Amino acid sequence: MKLSYVTDSLGHLPFEDMLNFAAKLGIDTLEMTTGGWSPAPHLNLDELLQSSEKRKEFSQALEKRNMTLCALNCSGNPLDPGELGKSHRDITDKTMELAGLLGVKKVIMMSGLPAGGPDDKVPNWITYTVSWPPVLKDILNYQWEDVAIPYWKKLVKKAEACGVGKIALENFSSQLVYNPETLFRLRNAVGPMVGLNLDPSHLLWMGADPIIAARELGSAIHHVHGKDVRIERYLSAVNGLLETKEVTDPANRAWNYVAVGCGQDLQWWKEFFSVVKMMGYEGEVSLEMEDLTMSPEAGIRTSVEALKQTISQ
């Protein structure tokens, strides 16, 4: 496996400065965002699609630093029932096209989350037993059978036509696919191009064990994010882990995304990566730095040091 980096946490730096910072840390593989939830600070999707000269300049900036692009990331909500969904679907289609033009074989996404019915206007995340109230069962059936699976069947065909080999869905909250079981429900319906972007931080705060999850996923692991989470023991013991406070208020949250090694110790990370590799994954581990208790640069350095000690080469 190889250390990569999601460049958004250095979004305050211009493209070339970001590349130089990453190169000094020994990172030579990048994952870059194209839009969706991200402002795409280092990549202009429409510009690169429309101009072969701009694509050449972009590629040369990477090549002169001996860097490669391992994946494009268009995470958003393509299943939103309103204008947001329309915009994110357009960005997704364009990302597939740009991946084809750049020779990038992997696209990182989120599954999306539909509304609860054809007349609803906002997404609806069902995470409680469908036994009560009974309408929850109808909502989930609508979301999966009427919205998600038909969309994803079309998107897989689009990706195939563009030369994309893998779509990796992040197991993120407020998405229809948020764990291995929901990933397999979609994968079984649309095919093996769709796999998981295994982000252990989300599984941990949801109460799962990412190491055991990796065993269950096997060849369905299409990508890995190196991101840690810390359960804040005092607040989580009082209120549990269901949390709606802003991420910008870490002192008052029950859990927080933190630099790698500031939540789980290095022995945990060694075992996690060892099992991921044992299950056949040989790809990139993209550092995603979202620790708001320190500067982006400090968090990246802390995480890179931890990941270099623990990734199974």
UniProtKB/Swiss-Prot annotation:
One Pfam entry name: AP_endonuc_2
InterPro entries, per database record: IolE/XylAMocC-like, Xyl_isomerase-like_sf, Xyl_isomerase-like_TIM-brl
Top-level taxon of origin: Bacteria
Name this protein carries in UniProt: Uncharacterized protein YfiH
Organism: Bacillus subtilis (strain 168)
Gene that encodes the chain: yfiH
